[in-house]
């Protein structure tokens, strides 16, 4: 039995309870002793949580030297202070000007008062003594001189085996077995409910946890998942099959990653390729098209897909070649954009896409599906805004109200696929397809409270973030 455990027992003999805060020993030793005593039934242990206000490093500096405004005033001589030197006292400068303790004349700053009482330092000292008022503590917290810290205290009381002085053996050795001494010993019982150390093994990335929850929502709604294992795509399936003009800005090298090797694709359905080209050039199916030249070499260029709608186009083409049957499909996978990397944008991200194939589907059906889908994501309050997409008409942007940010944010894009996209595939004129898409990273950042996307994806992600992040369910 350790010295700390013995001290706890001695204290319990004289009083009803012992608090860990009253024991002069390291936290780890106290905690270990309490666990050992509780496992043997000698004492019962409960945990009490509380919060206390403590000085931050900045607060401790104010306690030692004084507040920034006080130090600023003390450093201004009779000939004043230069503006350059004043800039080194950013916080003190603001408070001194606000209280009219200093004034500016030309390029120098002068005192308005000879001296001041350092009330901030006085509040810090009162806080440390425990005599500060709630208003004073709040004022110090706003200046980041005080922070709130969780305090955990363990309370031990006598257990059912407190008066049992039996010395328990924790390990059975070969010598005990050979000489038979184990028969006269009392062995400590195993606690099979005790938690062991977490193994240092691989962890599921938080983004993958979110992806699995998206998959669950789609599957619960009766959707089937499309295969998305083709990152390299031809411009034909990525752009042309979607009725996106060849002079569209998104097809420029500033927005798209083009492959050098292999540079071109040649494997296209010939009849479908011809239909798409004619629809672009002069229009078909009651459309004028783009009334411009359509170059097959432009369609052959290989790229890193810019959206998973290219996957949708391939699957819709296969569906059009079969006997008509309504379908609900979805995909979640990586896409690539040649964008400037910042706090909210990466050159690669995950796109979530869903589509419904049926007869007579219109904007009303799409809005109903979207309300149900986003409601399951925990975004019951959504709004729609008219938008433009080359391959959907009508098109809508979807906005959700984010309570934490207290504003409406764009959460997705949607629309009804144009006949110029569907008819060349072979669909009849009464077949409609409604679709929508959104990124996976944005809701993940919201759920995990992240402000910088590089904290979620990339080489700067903290490994502990992956190990300790809980699964965020959308409800």
UniProtKB/Swiss-Prot annotation:
The organism's place on the tree of life at top rank: Eukaryota
A single cellular component GO annotation: phenylalanine-tRNA ligase complex
Binding site residues for Mg(2+): 393
Localization annotation: Cytoplasm
Sequence positions that bind L-phenylalanine: 309, 351-353, 391, 417
Keywords for this protein: Aminoacyl-tRNA synthetase, ATP-binding, Cytoplasm, Ligase, Magnesium, Metal-binding, Nucleotide-binding, Protein biosynthesis
Keyword Ligase: yes
Region entry Contains the major tRNA-Phe binding sites, spans: 2-151
Gene3D superfamilies associated with the record: 1.10.10.2320, 1.10.10.2330, 3.30.1370.240, Bira Bifunctional Protein, Domain 2
GO molecular function term, any single one: phenylalanine-tRNA ligase activity
SUBUNIT field: Tetramer of two alpha and two beta subunits.
EC number per UniProt: 6.1.1.20
PANTHER family: PHENYLALANINE--TRNA LIGASE ALPHA SUBUNIT, PHENYLALANYL-TRNA SYNTHETASE
Catalysed transformations (reactions): tRNA(Phe) + L-phenylalanine + ATP = L-phenylalanyl-tRNA(Phe) + AMP + diphosphate + H(+)
InterPro entries, sorted: aa-tRNA-synth_II, aa-tRNA-synth_II/BPL/LPL, Phe-tRNA-synth_IIc_asu, Phenylalanyl-tRNA_Synthase, PheRS_DBD3
SUPFAM superfamilies: Class II aaRS and biotin synthetases (SSF55681)
Entries under NCBIfam families matching the protein: pheS, PRK04172.1
Similarity comment: family membership: Belongs to the class-II aminoacyl-tRNA synthetase family. Phe-tRNA synthetase alpha subunit type 2 subfamily.
Origin species: Encephalitozoon cuniculi (strain GB-M1)
Alphabetical GO biological process terms: phenylalanyl-tRNA aminoacylation
Signal peptide: none
Record's protein name: Probable phenylalanine--tRNA ligase alpha subunit
